[in-house]
From Swiss-Prot:
This is Carboxysome shell protein CsoS1A. GO terms for cellular component: carboxysome. The lineage of its organism: Bacteria, Pseudomonadati, Pseudomonadota, Gammaproteobacteria, Thiotrichales. Homohexamer with a small central pore. Forms a CsoS2-CsoS1-RuBisCO complex. Gene3D superfamilies: 3.30.70.1710. It comes from Hydrogenovibrio crunogenus (strain DSM 25203 / XCL-2) (Thiomicrospira crunogena). Belongs to the bacterial microcompartments protein family. CsoS1 subfamily. Keywords: Bacterial microcompartment, Carbon dioxide fixation, Carboxysome. PANTHER family: BACTERIAL MICROCOMPARTMENT SHELL PROTEIN PDUJ, PROPANEDIOL UTILIZATION PROTEIN PDUA. InterPro entries: Bact_microcomp_CS, BMC_dom, BMC_shell, CcmK-like_sf, CcmK/CsoS1_BMC.
Length: 96
């Protein structure tokens, strides 16, 4: 199944615990699919979710709030409503 046209939500954290907390909150808050977790380096972890734009927006908000409750774990939170088709290969590079 192609994810082209489906929203992408991203949360980057300092450490694994805030990342797990964010992933848990995001998947509980809205109908989104957890698609990837990347260890970026230096203790940073990025969590990616996909779904309809409204659901991804709600999920990323919930994930960011959960991260902030854990401590100083939130680095960034961002949503791309419809990633361009040229961006899709970049998103799947690390998953292979």
């Amino acid at each position: 199944m192609s994810d082209y046209g489906i929203a992408l939500g991203m949360i980057e954290t300092r450490g694994l615990v805030p990342a797990i907390e964010a992933a848990d909150a995001m998947t509980k808050a809205a109908e989104v699919r957890l698609v990837s977790r990347e260890f970026v380096g230096g203790g940073y972890v990025t969590v990616l979710v996909r779904g309809e734009t409204g659901a991804v927006n709600a999920a990323v908000r919930a994930g960011a709030d959960a991260c902030e409750r854990v401590g100083d774990g939130l680095v960034a939170a961002h949503i791309i409503a419809r990633p361009h088709k040229e961006v899709e290969p970049v998103l799947t590079m690390e998953q292979k």
